[in-house]
Amino acid sequence: MTRLRTLLLSLVALCALGGTAQAQMPLRIYVDAAPLFNLSHAKTLQDVSENKLFVGYRLGAGVDVNVGKMMYIGSGLTFAMKGNQYTFLSPKGEGDIKIYSHYMQIPINVGVRLNLTPTIGASVEAGPYFAYALGATVSQGKILDDIQKTYNVYKDGILGMDGAKLKRYDIGLVAKAKVTFGSWYGMVGADMGFVDELKLDEKNDPELEKLGQKAMRNTSFYLGAGFTF
């Protein structure tokens, strides 16, 4: 029992010392995770009754390098599932279209950190991100053919339409705020994509009018936690 108590006290002390040491270190390595809430808006050719919240994931790792007493530059690698879900109106009635895109994303952020105590701090950061889609699928509910189907958007096109596909890249702005407790931190952030992800070739596919969509950009926010080494 005495050994267990000693071990627990040692772990607590190490965490506290780790937080103090990190405040003085020139760089920090971190990992974090969060659910990603996508608010992407689909601009349509036809009427859309409702754009719905789409929940994905966000997993990240990277390094922050101090460039001043309070300022730092950070970069890393993030994997995120972004997408869009909306209700489509057709002569046959309503149905849902869900777009799932899995991105590998590289942010380049500039941030400011304030150490409130040796183990408690807060920071805000922002900068551009560059993303590449590793894969994407589109799920069609009971609308056009009254059956549910799933398509690979790079091979089959959206809803099987060769003239409607998604672009693999995205460029946008990321902003994030963190509150640190020793080696742990909580975070809230947002991604705003600038690229219209939808690539249409209306001349080659007259059926595109059924899709009812002519633009889509990635917009999302997240609330999660991370650990700093």
Feature map (PLM): residue ranges:
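Bacterial Sec-dependent N-terminal signal peptides
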Residues: 1-32, 225-229
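Residues on the lipid-exposed face of transmembrane beta-strands in outer-membrane beta-barrel proteins
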Residues: 31-35, 57-67, 77-79, 106-112, ...
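Short glycine/proline- and aromatic-enriched beta-strand/turn motifs that initiate or cap beta-hairpins
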Residues: 22-60, 166, 228
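Glutamine-centric residue-chemistry signal
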Residues: 22-24, 74, 105
